[in-house]
Amino acid sequence: MAEHAGRRCCLGWDFSTQQVKVVAVDAELNVFYEDSVHFDRDLLEFGTQGGVHVHEDGLTVTSPVLMWVQALDIILEKMKASGFDFSQVLALSGAGQQHGSVYWKAGASQVLASLSPDLLLHEQLQACFSISDCPVWMDSSTTAQCRQLEATVGGAQALSCLTGSRAYERISLVSSFAASLFLGSHSPIDYSDGSGMNLLRIQDKVWSQACLGACAPHLEEKLGLPVPSCSVVGAISSYFVQRYGFPPGCKVVAFTGDNPASLAGMRLEEGDIAVSLGTSDTLFLWLQEPTPTLEGHIFCNPVDPQHYMALLCFKNGSLMREKIRDELASSSWSEFSKALQSTEMGNSGNLGFYFDVMEITPEIIGRHRFSAENHEVSAFPWDVEIRALIEGQFMAKKIHAEGLGYRVMPKTKILATGGASHNRDILQVLADVFGTPVYVTDTANSACVGSAYRAFHGLAAGTDVPFSEVVKLAPNPRLAAAPTPGASQVYEALLQRYAMLEQRILTQTRGPPE
């Protein structure tokens, strides 16, 4: 097809929980091709639900590794059939669902290096994996091992680490496994995804001997040395050159995790924060100096090796907002917005905590309402309740972000995504609580697009070009809300009260802190 011909580009891949996706991005940073394979729908023979198998114990959750390989075959064949011009691909990179692991058999590297272009990948790699069903991020079958690791290294964050005596040649994350397919050899783990394993010392970017020793013997040689996330890990395998027409000089840039790739796709810069307002709410933070705590996850930054990124997840997100909307605003977002418009910033000192499911950050359940005098009350007027919910959700986000070392800077901007980002009144509260402007951007396929951006950055990284320079042509986000004058004074005192009351609830439910 003509529209796919003659455009020099980079490819971005995303090996996510439910599908494999690809985008092609040209030198002007326009997405001009995208495709996907959905595991449940397009690969019925694997019998997955939501891309996974949940085992009888209810704790073990796995995905068939050959399903991921076959999905890649299908997409590449579809691209070929559509007339996609692979000869124009300068580089590629990708993302993988975080915390999944792939176990290569001894001898797999020889198979990867000598693939026949006459056969599909999944036809040749069937005997290459020690474990055919890979544990993924939803797996919680290793709780005992996590506790043991914590005890061994004196309170390290939990790690799902399988041990055993099988002949593993190499252990990959989903990201480095996918890169290995394109490379024709074992790809190293990148710093950013590697820092989600609780085995990497994030300050000096080397494996922690204490954590490795707590998990399994000879683990370091199975993992290989980690590399910077913008590294070119090699040229594409001759298999792809011969079967699809990739140029021999096409570079493979280290693959990373889906969350770090999304940070790249949203083009966060130093001091920025992204808020994904979905079923659960997730914060992406760009940090200079992290303050590791028992909350959240801190990773090496995928686009700046000197800095860090953090993730904070809040379970009571859109479902909680929708529940209050249905209870108090006649299931109408416009009525919900009227409540926010008719109540004042700071809600006359009334504060609320709304956790219908056990929250992660912090570990609280239930609804708790407090008057301006910090007395717990049983109910608020309907409009006060709605503002208390939204203000409380955003104050919690700011407090816990600051707990990880985040500080609002003069040039800070918030990027809002997800369903609630379409409601300007909710975004106004977000701007007021944080005291910084809120922007919205189209982040469909952000991990995929971020991977293509990272491929361009990998091509330029040898010259120390900053990521922001590489992606300056990408579409700019749109301003959605600016802080109301006087907002910072209103919320400065409220934030202190909110943190104090949160601690009071925690103490009441689980006793005083040790």
Q: What are the residue ranges of the model-derived segments?
A:
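N-terminal glycine/serine-rich phosphate-binding loop of ATP-dependent small-molecule kinases
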Residues: 1-123, 241-251, 431-438, 465-470, ...
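Generic hydrophobic, aliphatic-rich segments that mediate packing or membrane embedding
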Residues: 68, 88, 97-100, 130-133, ...
